[in-house]
Amino acid sequence: MKKVAVIGTGVIGNGWITRFLANGCEVVAHDPAPGAKERTIQAIENAWESVEQLGLKEGASKDSLTFVDSIEEAVKDADLIQESVPERYELKHGVLKEIDRFAHSNTIIGSSTSGIKPTDLQIGLNHPERLVVAHPFNPVYLLPLVEIVGGEATTKEITNRASVYYESLQMKPMVIEKEIEGFVADRLMEALWREALHLVNDGIATTEEVDKAITYGAGLRWAQMGPFMTFHLAGGNAGMRHMLEQFGPALKLPWTKLEAPELTDELKERVIQGCETHANDRSVEELEKKRNEFLVKLIDLVEDYWP
């Protein structure tokens, strides 16, 4: 991948541009908004020290960016196209149809949408099979996760190609096999966000207290492992199996405003087997040791940067 087109240069688009440049790509950008080019140049300048600390790839340069006046000019020779216009369906769909019209038929188009299903974005495209969701996380130039989601017209070959593309950008692509609004990470964050709003609205906690609960509690663990492995370790030597036996009934308690799914035997086994596979033959004791080493370093960082 040598040449990348970025359509839309807001916060997300500029984050993509910075990541592409830091990985040695030539970037062609288009955004009709007044002052877009100047804002992009400033955004790159602000982020460059951070990407330098992560490590630049050979050929990385802030100067490998060109702004053009049309979508046609931006996408005509691109190896990858990243659409990052505002999150309005009519706008995104219209822009994607124009991209599809002018881009080479085998060029992958990645949409940065945070919630629209790719099948809905593929409607009316001449080559709908090459459009995938490639949803990043802010700041795009630092956070490695990118969710890749295909629509009904997308082939496995396309999602595999997209995954390879984004992995070459020092990212951690996660291919989501079944499309759903909001995908995976944002749905998890949305659940926490809604509960946080309930706690504040009901006068139970202030916004600062909610943030403190995450910053000095679960957030530290989540920086290394997600909820399933966190609870796997909480189950002691028996792991998730013991965790579900002991605490599974608590899902029926009215602790959140969200209704929990029925904890069926099938769901239990799926969760248990998933955690045991993820543990990769490492004992809970081994995992705890690694977690603790990580947390000691992370807590020091939190104290240094977030007093």
Swiss-Prot record:
Keywords: Cytoplasm, NAD, Oxidoreductase. The keyword Amino-acid biosynthesis does not apply. One of its GO terms (cellular component) is cytoplasm. Pathway: Amine and polyamine metabolism; carnitine metabolism. It catalyses: carnitine + NAD(+) = 3-dehydrocarnitine + NADH + H(+). SUPFAM superfamilies: 6-phosphogluconate dehydrogenase C-terminal domain-like, NAD(P)-binding Rossmann-fold domains. Its main location: cytoplasm. Catalyzes the NAD(+)-dependent oxidation of L-carnitine to 3-dehydrocarnitine. Belongs to the 3-hydroxyacyl-CoA dehydrogenase family. L-carnitine dehydrogenase subfamily. This is L-carnitine dehydrogenase.
